[in-house]
Design a protein with these regions (language model features):
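Membrane-interfacial amphipathic/re-entrant helices at transmembrane-helix boundaries
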Residues: 1-24, 58-64, 138
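Cytosolic-side transmembrane-helix boundaries in multi-pass membrane proteins
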Residues: 6, 162-165, 218, 237-288
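Loop-to-transmembrane alpha-helix initiation sites
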Residues: 17, 91-93, 140-145, 196-203, ...
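Membrane-embedded helix boundary and interhelical linker motif in transport proteins
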Residues: 32-87, 107-113, 127-134, 243
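Alpha-helical transmembrane segments within multi-pass membrane transporters and channels
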Residues: 61-100, 142-145, 149, 230, ...
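Helix-loop-helix "hairpin" substructures at the membrane interface of multi-pass membrane proteins
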Residues: 76, 135-201, 206
């Protein structure tokens, strides 16, 4: 049983999806941790990137599809920032408004169909398979890791943005990363669904907290690496749950439990440390 859980295929898939979804976690890291803004447009922006990438990829331009997805994400981030900085809308409400509007926009991009397929369409991953044939079956991970490396470098630079432009530029970068993640996922699984972004903000938050708890947050580079690690670990936990034949209908519950545990981890660690200190103090007192 353990051999099947820790099989190379499970680990590889978890790493591939972890790198793709890590872009969303990095976007949330920028908006939530650096800008201190609760951006709730993540779900809709992710689906927007997925839908735009699908439409452009269908025309035979998979790489242009990713750029188009990022451009769409920038537009989403700009609207969110405009509502906050120019119209005085609270960040949470701005995210909700944009997320609500994006549902109709996403449907329109998808031709008012709830699903799209790229089964017979060339994707960046099929191109990478030919270009990176020397990597064997690891070409998807190599491509996803390369994107993460570029995004991580951009994230470190973004942390020093002039405060005067922080909200607008930061949310535009955040939207671009989120939409890029959606575009990559669309080409990875060769499909798009109108509900693909549902719950994405909570999943990204879980990845962010897992990474910061296990890796730490002393330096910006360490925090970025922690986000990627947290995303991969989250995907591995989901893969293990599937290996235990957890019904697909129960995966939302599994995700909710993972998120709850991840969010409470700092408090749990603090409580354990406090109990250890109290126990040590009691032992010293009894020794005296």
């Amino acid at each position: 049983m353990l051999a099947s859980i820790f099989s190379l295929n499970v680990i590889q898939t978890a790493l591939e999806l972890g790198c793709i979804y890590a872009l969303v976690a990095l976007a949330l890291f920028l908006s939530y941790s650096i800008l201190n803004i609760a951006d709730l447009s993540t779900d809709g922006c992710f689906t927007l990137g997925c839908a735009v990438a699908c439409q452009v990829a269908l025309t035979g331009h998979p790489f242009l599809a990713l750029l188009a997805a990022m451009a769409a994400g920038v537009c989403s981030g700009f609207v969110t920032a405009f509502l906050q900085t120019r119209l005085g809308v609270e960040s949470i409400m701005a995210g909700i408004i944009v997320n609500t509007g994006l549902y109709t926009i996403n449907l329109a991009v998808m031709g008012f169909s709830s699903t799209m397929s790229l089964v017979k369409t060339e994707t960046v991953f099929s191109i990478a398979k030919r270009a990176l044939s020397f990597t064997g079956g690891w070409y998807k991970l190599v491509l996803a890791a390369a994107v993460i490396a570029l995004a991580g470098a951009a994230m470190v630079r973004a942390s020093s943005i002039n405060p005067a432009f922080t909200i607008t530029v930061g949310l535009c970068i955040s939207g671009a990363l989120t939409a890029l993640s959606g575009g990559l996922l669309a080409q990875y699984q060769k499909s798009c669904d109108i509900n693909v972004g549902t719950g994405m903000v909570t999943i990204a938050l879980a990845s962010l907290i897992i990474g910061e708890t296990l890796v730490g947050r002393r330096t910006m580079v360490r925090r970025v690496l922690g986000v990627v690690f947290g995303s991969c670990l989250y995907r591995f936990i989901v893969a293990v749950a599937l290996r235990f034949n957890v019904p697909a209908a129960a995966m939302k519950l599994v995700s909710a439990i993972i998120v709850a545990v991840a969010i409470s981890m700092p408090a749990i660690k603090e409580k354990i440390a406090f109990e250890k200190r109290r126990s040590a103090a009691r032992t010293r007192k009894e020794g005296v």
